[in-house]
Every structure is written in structure tokens, then in C-alpha cells.
Amino acid sequence: MENLQVKALPKEFLLGTATAAYQVEGATRVDGKGINMWDVYLQENSPFLPDPASDFYYRYEEDIALAAEHGLQALRLSISWVRIFPDIDGDANVLAVHYYHRVFQSCLKHNVIPFVSLHHFDSPQKMLETGDWLNRENIDRFIRYARFCFQEFTEVKHWFTINELMSLAAGQYIGGQFPPNHHFQLSEAIQANHNMLLAHALAVLEFHQLGIEGKVGCIHALKPGYPIDGQKENILAAKRYDVYNNKFLLDGTFLGYYSEDTLFHLNQILEANNSSFIIEDGDLEIMKRAAPLNTMFGMNYYRSEFIREYKGENRQEFNSTGIKGQSSFKLNALGEFVKKPGIPTTDWDWNIYPQGLFDMLLRIKEEYPQHPVIYLTENGTALKEVKPEGENDIIDDSKRIRYIEQHLHKVLEARDRGVNIQGYFIWSLQDQFSWANGYNKRYGLFFVDYETQKRYIKKSALWVKGLKRN
């Protein structure tokens, strides 16, 4: 890796951090909260439970103050749907409404701008039982929830509708790490993505019809796919992977339809896996109307993939332990993930490749010139860390600093090349519960002792605090 240092940021560039309600709040049975899909699934299938997680439900003031004290100007967080509507068809929960008002007011008091997601991997259990995003009736339920939040939380000026559509659908219907734990159901995964893109479009239209002040968009986790070499079949496999993971979503968001090229390659993948998806009459009309009304876009980036052609039985191994070499991914007619010599990986087998971030930002600029302002809404790396011996000891996470610096450098380089990107959010503010890894996968700028809930400062937080402004 090149030797570089980021010492200063543009004056108007936002530096923030990110969380998600279910991963940090805890308090899963408090103040009338309803049941979401993880409450049931984890109780039945996991040794890890998300209570108290990082205890953010009670410690939000402390955590937001820590963010402000260390130079973070924005906080990405999400609202728990089942706190607001314990019964998704019932009345709003006043206690939850008051709670989120307090959280947002705390952000504003500390001069931390709240960027709020409505859905972050946490559908209500009743929604899951009725098909989750595969059931179009649940789109109507989501719009009801979105409308309520848009109108109620007027202190929020930055709204994201749905977080990481493909990550959610792939976790539910390809890898099976997320409820309902289905495997290699391509029809379900692609249909869920299309329906979420439609739900996002309807929420954007609702936002503007209501005359809400602020910005609105969605968040995609984009992962560039590179052929492992110059062989024609591997180039084609990388192309198909890109369509599946990136272009399908970007077309639907910024164009409001799927290009001929996208549909051609997507159909090749679907046909090879005896799968299909349905675009109903009127869907693309709605998506086209909404596309130019996106006023911001959230991009999450952690890794790129190197692809080799694969034709055979679908297989995926998920690394849930942090022991290198346990993960694999092989999807018929899409490709196989392979390691490229010289590219480092995390303990969870994620490639560390900052150039992929730069390439994707430039690509969005070139292929979707109508795109709105971009925020890198998640970027960070997980480490295995232990509680320090002294009460005031600083945890040395130099590897995290290096990771952040490399990626932030690429963001600023892309910005210099004309990409309209105006912020960078580190995942995550504090250590938190991981959906499929429990508590040993630590991303935070602040270490959480889960037994006492004490926060310890990491070196990365001090590094962030030391960044200057041009």
C-alpha cells in the first residue's frame, strides 16, 4: 500500500460516524417496543442476543457527546420501525416517538447533524411472516411508517429510506445468515430488491408531496467486481457479478428503470439458476418519476471482489469467527470469489482495496451524471480487541487508522476529480452487536465493555479528532 497521510479535510466536507438501531440500542422489551424479525430469529438460532448491545437506548447522550468531543460533525442512525409502530397496522407508540425526539435533539444540542435511516435490516416480525419485501402489501405499510416519520421528526433534515438493499436480500435469500434463512433463492433475492427499489421510489415521492424540508435518498453497499485475470470467461463473470450487485441497484435508483444491458446479464444469471422476477405494470413509471427527486445518495463501501467464472452447484461459506480463510462464494453463472495475491484481507476475509472505492465513485460520476450529492455512509474495519487494563488506557487500533486513512484519501482524490461527494461516515461510532458475528467483531471508534458498558477511547478516535480543516 502507498504511504500517505490525510492531515486536513475540506472545510465544507462532513466527517461523521454511523450506527444502527438494533445493533446499539438494546432495550428490546422496553417502552412498548414491538417484535422485529431478529428478536425471534436470534432467540431461536443464535448464542448472541442484542440486549443490552451498546445500551444506546439509555446512553445516547454520552455517545453523542463523545462523537462531538472528537470532531465528528454528523451521526448516521436508524429508527426502529417496531418502536414507532409495535403493531405495524396499529397506532404510533408515544414513548418511542418521544425517545427519538430526545435523541435527535441531543444531536442538535451537540452540533452533530442526524442522518436518519427508516429501515436498517430490521423488518417487523409481522412483515416477515407475511413475506417481508416479497409481499407488495408491505410496501404500503412502509410508506405509512415513512410518512409518519417524515411529518413527525421535523428536526431531521437528512433521510435515508432503506439501508443496503442487496445486503439484506442476499442475507435473507442467498447466504441465509438473515431470517428467513433461505439459500440461493435468486428469484426471491432479485424480487425483494426490485420491490425495495419501488418502495424507496414511493417514499421519495411521498417526501416531496408532503413538502418536507431536507434531503432524501437511499443507501447501497457497492462492491466492485474485478476479473481475476484477462481471460474472457472471467471478464464476463465479473461483468455479471457487477450487474447483480451494483448496476441493477444503480439503474433502478438513478435511471428509474433497468437498462437493456442490465436486464440481459441479469436474465442470464436468473435463467442459469431457474429463476425469474416480475416487474408489474406501473412500477417503472413510479421509479422514473422518483429518480430525479433523489436529493442525496448514501454509498457504503467495505471491500471489492475478484471474480473467476463458475458453473456448478451454488455454495457459500460465511466467516462468523474471524479466523481467516473460512469464507467462500460460488454462484452458478455469476462467479466465484477468489483471492488476489498482494491484496490484504481482514480476519473475516474481506479484501482491503481502497482503489475499488475510488473506481466506484468515478464510475457513478461517469455513468450516472444526474446523481445527487454522495455521502460515503459506511466505511471501516473490524478488529479483535480486548478490554484495556487501566481505566484510562487508550486502545491502540493503528490498523483501523490506516484503513480509514487509505479510504478517506481515495474519497478526497475522487472529489478532486469532480465527484460530488460531501461526507465520510466511519462505521462505527462505538462497538456494537453484529447481526451474524455477535460481539467479537469490533468496528467502533470507542471500545465498549459489554459487561459494564464503560466506554474506552481508541487511538482512532484521537486521530479523527486531530484532523484539521483547510
From Swiss-Prot:
Pathway as given in its UniProt record: Carbohydrate metabolism; lactose degradation; D-galactose 6-phosphate and beta-D-glucose from lactose 6-phosphate: step 1/1
Catalytic activity entry: a 6-phospho-beta-D-galactoside + H2O = D-galactose 6-phosphate + an alcohol
Binding site for D-galactose 6-phosphate: 23, 120, 163-164, 300, 434-435, 441, 443
Active site: 164 (proton donor), 378 (nucleophile)
SUPFAM superfamilies: (Trans)glycosidases (SSF51445)
GO CC, alphabetical: cytosol
InterPro entries hit by this protein: 6P-beta-galactosidase (IPR005928), Glyco_hydro_1 (IPR001360), Glycoside_hydrolase_SF (IPR017853)
Keywords noted in UniProt: Glycosidase, Hydrolase
Gene3D superfamilies in UniProt: Glycosidases
Documented EC number(s): 3.2.1.85
Molecular function as annotated in GO: 6-phospho-beta-galactosidase activity; beta-glucosidase activity
Keyword Lipid metabolism: no
Source superkingdom: Bacteria
Annotated family: Belongs to the glycosyl hydrolase 1 family.
PANTHER family: GLYCOSYL HYDROLASE, LP05116P
Protein name per UniProt: 6-phospho-beta-galactosidase 1
Species, as recorded: Streptococcus pneumoniae serotype 4 (strain ATCC BAA-334 / TIGR4)
Lineage: Bacteria, Bacillati, Bacillota, Bacilli, Lactobacillales
